[in-house]
Amino acid sequence: YTSDNQYASSAKAEHDALAYFIATSNCDAIDGGIVVFSAGNDALNRAGYPGAFRDYISVTSFSPDFLPASYTNYGPGCNISAPGGDAYIASNMTATVLSTMPSEVNDGSDYGYMQGTSMACPHVSGVAALGLSYALKQGKHYTRNEFISMLLTSVNDMERYLDGTKNSNGTMYLENYRKKLGTGAVDAYQLLMQIEGTPCLKVGVGAEELVPLTQFFGGSASRR
């Protein structure tokens, strides 16, 4: 698919089912459903569908070195990033993700090492589920858009690492990924603190940050 309209018309049954899910409230903490998809593993400068659709969250992948995975899609349609593994940066499978998988695929075991944005995607859906569970415990309720905004801002910055090159299945020019991996690397702790109402700030070593206190304490706050 190359556009939202093409996806919505060509995959109508899927689109309509997900639209129903989005519009239906099944949890007291939120007024609708959240759809999370992988961005794709083609190293393309755009998210693949269905994840690229405007109402869904599309997840890119970074490897254990906190840099983009060699295969991840990036660019338009991508919303947030999470660990997905990258076998090319290590001599064995330690740089990939231990995942559940059909036992008949892996010599009778229910687990195997894999990589991909499909490994990254469950990190984000899991963090979202954890956040909604905590919101229920806290007696909080959010609109769908409010919660998605909180999720997409509960991230660690990746931009300062996107400089130079990385050797992973070829040479990757990291500047090509700037502002294209989504808002950053998903952080469960930051989401829980947002739900709790506790300010949670992270600043890089040697960096300076100007923090407006009104963002956390209202218009009457003053710096001391």
Residue ranges and their predicted role:
Residues 197-224:
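Extracellular ectodomain surface segments
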Residues 26, 40, 185-200:
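Secreted peptidase-domain scaffold signal
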Residues 62:
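Carbohydrate-associated surface elements
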Residues 1-55, 65-67, 104-123:
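Substrate-binding/access-modulating region of protease and related hydrolase catalytic domains
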Residues 85-86, 90-181:
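Hydrolase catalytic cores
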Residues 26-35, 54-58, 78, 146, ...:
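Loop/turn elements at helix/coil->beta-strand transitions in domains of secreted/extracellular proteins
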